[in-house]
């Protein structure tokens, strides 16, 4: 699953959740946006917040709400639970389970 922050309509940055059936990884991918634009768009969308230039905290409930209605994998919910458990075991899930720490990478082709 990828949360992208890319330049959208009218050259205004927007956040969108893509590759929703690929729960083997969860990352934040930035297109041609500044760090400030990425931080603003993430917070405005409710999907999360930047932690630093290389990591972000994604809101688990908001991410699931954005992705699940569009999921096509029959076992998507079980895959989601496995992804969250993997984040917990790797120390990337907040103590309250509300956010998942993810890597920031470039949105190739964005």
Task: Name each model-derived stretch.
Residues 2-62:
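Short helix/strand-capping turn motifs
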Residues 66-110:
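Short, compact, well-ordered microdomains
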């Amino acid at each position: 699953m990828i949360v992208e922050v890319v330049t959208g309509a009218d050259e205004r940055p927007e956040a969108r959740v893509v590759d929703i059936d690929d729960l083997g990884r969860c990352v934040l991918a930035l297109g041609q946006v500044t760090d400030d634009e990425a931080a603003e768009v993430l917070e405005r969308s409710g999907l999360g917040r930047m932690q630093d230039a290389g990591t972000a905290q994604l809101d688990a409930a908001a991410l699931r709400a954005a992705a699940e209605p569009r999921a096509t994998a029959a076992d998507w919910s079980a895959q989601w639970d496995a992804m969250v458990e993997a984040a917990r075991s790797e120390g990337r899930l907040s103590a309250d389970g509300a956010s998942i720490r993810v890597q920031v990478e470039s949105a190739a082709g964005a």
